Amino acid sequence: MSFPRLRQTAIALAASMMMVGLSACGGGSDDPAPTAPVVAASVPDASMHFNRVATFAVCAQVGASCESATPVNAEIVAASSDGMTLIYTSGLSRQIGFVDITDPAAPVGLGALTLVGEPTSVAVVGAHALVAVNTSASFTAPTGKLVVVHIATRTKVAELDLGGQPDSVAVSKDGRYAAVVIENERDESVNGGAIPQLPAGRLAIIDLVGAPAAWTRRDVALTGLAA
């Protein structure tokens, strides 16, 4: 037996319920638009940011008006123990420079010290600056030294052979040791710069005991660590 009118009524009721459901989910044009929560704008805290107070042209160390043709740069910078003097490396001119920042807003150049070789890094321990200097004649025969400079007088007081090309230097917190990375950099023109290329790099540890002339070096091999 067929009930066509009942079937039509059921279909109409189902369609009506579906439309009600869609209307409830989608919302009508009269519904209020959602609003984002109000967030107060933050106020920058100047004490938590780097704020430039001055600049210093390192070229002024070789010419008051930077008129000299001598190329200079400031690559690595360290501060004296009292924080009043900056020491920077200038590999292009083979020098280290000194800047007085007793008044940070008005830095004063104190001159530069010329070295035999390229300074690659500098660190400070006590009254001295420890300068890593690359003296290599070639990639296959790397050499270097640690030059010890008295900061106040800006004079060299000692040298220590490093037996390879140094890249960077750091001093332990207690001031008893200096660690020098002996890079012995590779020749990028050989085999596309691929490694291995000998001699291998290593770590040099300098025992800072006694006067600078009495400091000694210990080497730490870094080969075979991937095995």
Named regions from a protein language model:
Residues S2-L13:
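Bacterial N-terminal signal peptides that target proteins for export
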Residues V43-A227:
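Mobile, glycine-rich extracellular loop/lid and propeptide segments
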Residues C25-P34:
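Bacterial lipoprotein signal-peptidase II cleavage site
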Residues P34-S42:
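Low-complexity, Pro/Ser/Thr-rich intrinsically disordered segments
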